[in-house]
Amino acid sequence: MQLKRSFFIMAFAISALTIQVPIFAADAELPVVFTEDFEKGSDSWEILDPNTWKLSERQGNSTLEITKRKSEYQPEVRSPRHIALIKDVEVEDFELTFKVRSTKDTGNHRDCCVFFAWQDKTHFYYSHLGAKPDPHSGQIMIVKDAPRKALTTNETRTPWTDKWHHVKVTRTASTGEIVVYFDDMEQPHMQVSDMTFKRGRIGIGSFDDLNEFDDIVLRGK
């Protein structure tokens, strides 16, 4: 009887520890450091070519939109031309979510870009959500004093339509892990690990296409 009682107490203790694990994980969720719905304008953004972006309103909802494919911003090395960076925020670990609508079908390289660990105009990562992947489209890229270079060999198409889509990008600086999601928030669209850059700024945009953005939430530290 004593042996059975001791076993029961031990099993209960182990069970209690197991139950507490998800609670600990929830507590570890990164804090929200920035949100944007553009209802009060775009003053929180540094736009590298303001003449190709505008605030738009449809049915009472405000968005930020790229309106011209050609940009006056000409980067020193081959890399995206439409870039809007969040002001006064730098993160190392982060989770970025937002809605995006591609407003022009430009074919295989129809895209949206997400910028992160931005140091300056020639040092940063970006995710290129191109419709058809190749070495210059549909990959996680690095810019480091040279034209953009793919870190991934992704072969999964980005299924653009004219409707709104959901994007999530996560980064764990301690391991270098970068994970990108498109519509399906459980199954990664592409992922890689790289330790070149850690803390930096976050941005949205496109290589040279037209997009509309809304409902941006950045969690990070």
Question: Which stretches of residues belong to each language-model region?
Answer:
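Short tryptophan-centered beta-strand motifs in secreted/extracellular beta-sheet-rich domains
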Residues: 38, 98, 162-173, 178-180
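Extracellular carbohydrate-recognition regions
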Residues: 26-50
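Beta-strand-rich interaction surfaces with strong enrichment in secreted/lumenal proteins
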Residues: 82-89, 152-159, 202-203
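Extracellular glycan-recognition surfaces and repeat-rich motifs
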Residues: 42-72
